[in-house]
Amino acid sequence: FKPAPENPILSQRHLPAERPFKVDWAGHADLVEGPDGQYYGVFLAIRPNEENRVNTGRETFILPVDWSGTFPVFKGGLEPIQPKLAMPQGVKNETGKNGYFPNGNFTFTETFTGSSLDYRWVGVRGAREGFISTTAEGLTITPYETNIKAVLPTSTLFYRQQHLNFTATTTLKYVPRTEKDLAGITCYQSEKFNYVFGVTKKAEDSYIVLQRTEKGESSTIASEKIEGNTPISLRVTAEGDKYTFSYSVKDNNYQTVGGTVSGDILSTNVAGGFTGAMIGLYATTSNDAEAL
């Protein structure tokens, strides 16, 4: 390869760190010819939050490329990249259709009553169908004995975090039999970096617990005694780096558990790697999130 004399042709490193709607770490581009005969560069970049942490991982961007000379040059490759870019002429926008992921602001509701799962739901280290079944009443999870920190298949059903700001809610019908039983939700970067927010048991009572795991070491942030034998709604809300976990047993009156916590352990800056965090449904019979 012969380096281009105009290098770099795609970079954000020279731009002010505090610029609004920042897109950063641009690179790893593929050059393609579009249906309009114009060249484009499809590349990876990230959208950091207000703490400059990356919880959504690498994402795909596109810019037009001028290849009229000897070397390709990205049009706008040294300018602040915008989170939303124009579609190439002749390309049909099928965002959110026919197996393509949705983009931008949207809501997604899953009842789990269909015969098959939406393609957006993913498992870890094993087929998702190994521990779930869909019924007329919703999803049933038959929990594995493995804990979420195990490097083994776990009974977790995930949806990738796509937004810096989001709310995810689920309603749970569950009665733990022992302190080793837990079911709820998780925000997950890896087996070593995650939050678990779920229902478990202490003595004869049911509790909602919030557990934080960093570098494989877990601690219970907070817990609250709750009514047993009652459906419970669990919710996680993120505003950039700030995450809150809450629950409701009636009338959508949500109570926060553990206050506002940092999403630092869900970022690639802290946990490593390049993929974003996931929000998931989780159940286990090897729980170690103890009620306080």
State the predicted function of each range.
Residues F1-L292:
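Carbohydrate-active catalytic/glycan-binding domains of CAZyme proteins
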